[in-house]
């Protein structure tokens, strides 16, 4: 049986840039989060007027999106350059309520990922899942 992790969650505030409906640049703060108890996922919380918006994606998707286009459907990521020529990760989020395309500086995203890898290295995610608990949850419906 795998034992649940004892490491605390990793969180990091990362500024995101986007454009409003009139094409004006906007910057807002987002929280990127990682819980070793859910080792395959990262969580993004967009702190925007009207309330926080939460998204989850695979940690491997975020890592891939730093270097090459990744994802399909609800979340797509790709490396890009901002208007000042700085490396960014572009992220395109689709939901029934709308679409949001944002950019985060690559160095910020990489710093966050490096902190998650220090807690649970890539490829070691399965070691951090309590399989008995997972089966119990699935059977409980």
Label each region the model flagged.
Residues 17-19, 45-47, 78-80, 94:
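A structural detector for beta-sheet-dominated domains
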Residues 94-141:
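Mixed-charge, glycine-accented linear interaction segment located at domain edges/termini
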Residues 1-41:
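Charge-rich, low-complexity N-terminal segments
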Residues 25-70:
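Short, well-structured hydrophobic secondary-structure segments
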Residues 22, 36, 50-52, 83, ...:
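Residues that cap or initiate secondary-structure elements
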Residues 44, 89-93, 102:
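Generic recognition of long tandem-repeat/solenoid scaffolds
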Residues 52-96:
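Short, internal acidic amphipathic alpha-helical interface segments
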Residues 12-16, 55-56, 102:
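Generic detection of short hydrophobic beta-strand segments and adjacent strand-loop junctions
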């Amino acid at each position: 049986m795998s034992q649940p992790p004892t490491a605390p969650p990793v969180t990091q505030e990362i500024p995101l840039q986007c454009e409003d409906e009139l094409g004006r640049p906007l910057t807002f703060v987002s929280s990127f989060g990682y819980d070793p108890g859910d080792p395959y996922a990262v969580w993004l919380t967009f702190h925007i007027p009207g309330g926080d918006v939460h998204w989850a994606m695979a940690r491997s998707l975020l890592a891939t999106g730093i270097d090459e286009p990744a994802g399909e459907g609800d979340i797509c990521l790709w490396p890009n350059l901002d208007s000042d020529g700085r490396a960014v990760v572009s992220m395109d989020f689709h939901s029934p309520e709308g679409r949001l395309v944002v950019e985060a500086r690559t160095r910020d995203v990489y710093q966050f990922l490096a902190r998650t890898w220090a807690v649970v290295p890539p490829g070691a995610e399965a070691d951090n899942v309590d399989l008995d608990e997972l089966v119990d949850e699935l059977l409980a419906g």
